[in-house]
Amino acid sequence: MEKYDLITILGPTASGKTPLAAALAYKLDTEIISGDSRQVYRRMDLGTGKDLEDYVVNGQQIPYHLIDIVDPGYKYNVFEFQRDFLNAYDQVRWKDKLPILCGGTGMYLESVLKGYRLLPVPENPKLRDSLADKSLAELTRLLSTYRKLHNSTDVDTVKRAIRAIEIEEYYKHQSAEYREFPQIHSLIIGVDIARELRREKISHRLKQRLDEGMVNEVKALLDSGISSEDLIYYGLEYKYLTLYVLGKLSFNEMFHQLEIAIHQFAKRQMTWFRGMERRGFTIHWLDACLPMEDKVEKIINLLHTKN
């Protein structure tokens, strides 16, 4: 009987997650499910770093899921990701294969590893009013009486604690069947890249994608009728390149501000992954600089290692 139902490969931007996932998928004859919140969009290729050529290993196309599934302008969210992930996961498992979930969007990855379905929770003004005068200590005690959906590290302010209670209260009144989400036992691999090397690779990739036509990609999206507000909403490359195309930033301003923003984004990704470890997930970190064959071999050894 298989020890794991899934392999998850995570890491910050420019760490080499996708080539590793593809090399592993080739070795295991399996398929990749993308866990990236922006690669779901069609025609947003250079700006989201799709690098589709990475999915070809030794001349073989590695099947992938959840890339290019919605049109630009749409506001895709984590609730839809859970649904779409399960559909893709079931398709791969149906073939008796071990799927590989690969991405850097921590919220998306954690949403399927946690084991409960996320629901969009509306505000409850009446409940908020009833909690408004309580201290953080009182709210934390109250929160502890619910089925534990939240970790205490997430509720370090009164506002967060009230929202956590609001979510717990909403879930309490949903049927168990509605909340059901399969328990997926995943081997989680983290690609660990030294900060300076990460920064160097981010800067190199940014220059490379600009050379490959990222500005023209943004112009084409705007020309096709996608609003500048929608592109700015997607953040990072699309935000700063749109501001550049609109004449609100010079090229140098755009490049400098975008470079800083991507470095900050990578740092936030690592913060999320370290938070996952505090929340009880075991992440097996591999040095990004190891030869690909060594990384793949280490993962396969972990797959077969007994607890």
UniProtKB/Swiss-Prot annotation:
Cofactor(s) annotated in UniProt: Mg(2+)
Domain of life: Bacteria
Keywords noted in UniProt: ATP-binding, Magnesium, Nucleotide-binding, Transferase, tRNA processing
Disulfide bonds: none
Residues flagged as site, Interaction with substrate tRNA: 105
Enzyme Commission number: 2.5.1.75
Binding site for ATP: 11-18
Record flagged with keyword tRNA processing: yes
Gene Ontology biological process terms in this record: tRNA modification
Listed InterPro entries: Dimethylallyltransferase, IPT, P-loop_NTPase
Coiled coil spans: none
Record field: catalytic activity: adenosine(37) in tRNA + dimethylallyl diphosphate = N(6)-dimethylallyladenosine(37) in tRNA + diphosphate
GO molecular function, one term: ATP binding
Ranges for region Interaction with substrate tRNA: 36-39
Binding positions (substrate): 13-18
PANTHER family, alphabetized: TRNA DIMETHYLALLYLTRANSFERASE
Its job: Catalyzes the transfer of a dimethylallyl group onto the adenine at position 37 in tRNAs that read codons beginning with uridine, leading to the formation of N6-(dimethylallyl)adenosine (i(6)A).
Family: Belongs to the IPP transferase family.
Quaternary structure (record): Monomer.
Protein name in the entry: tRNA dimethylallyltransferase 2
